[in-house]
Amino acid sequence: TKNLKWKLKLPGYGASSPIVWNDRVYLTCYSGYGAGSRGGSPSGLMRHLVCVDARTGKSVWQQQLKPTKSEDNYSGMGVPQHGYASSTPATDGKAIYVFLAKSGLAAFDLKGKKLWQTSVGSSSSRKRWGSSSSPIIHGDLVFINALQEGHKIFALNKADGKIAWQWGPDAYSSYQDTYG
């Protein structure tokens, strides 16, 4: 701990990786259902997008993101292993893009204001893996592998969240890797 510069108590658990842009760190976590004692009701699930000052470790802002659609139960093969905050955010320096599983892909400005949120499906695989895909940015598009939720890979316009195109086998997949 002698090299530890700062430490911040988060509002919940998470398996996503933090990202850094200039002097800010962005990360996701979740609280309520499936957190801590692993009890509670699915209606209590809350995701959080947290912005931290990289120099001081102080929270700059937080967004609480209540699911818009029911998520997989905290059981099965995937969700108990990684929880409800496995997707790593992405940024282009103008917005933060966060995959919220069955609640879709959302964009926030760097001050935490929600710009848009777009559904990409709400299905579940038989094994209930849960979601772990992370958005990828290229040019004017943000990509998400939503094979669990929407049976497709989606490209959305960064500016407004409208779906530019989608491709997929129209079948469930076991893993969610996206390569660009």
Predicted regions, residues:
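Noncatalytic, solvent-exposed loop/strand surfaces
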Residues: 1-180
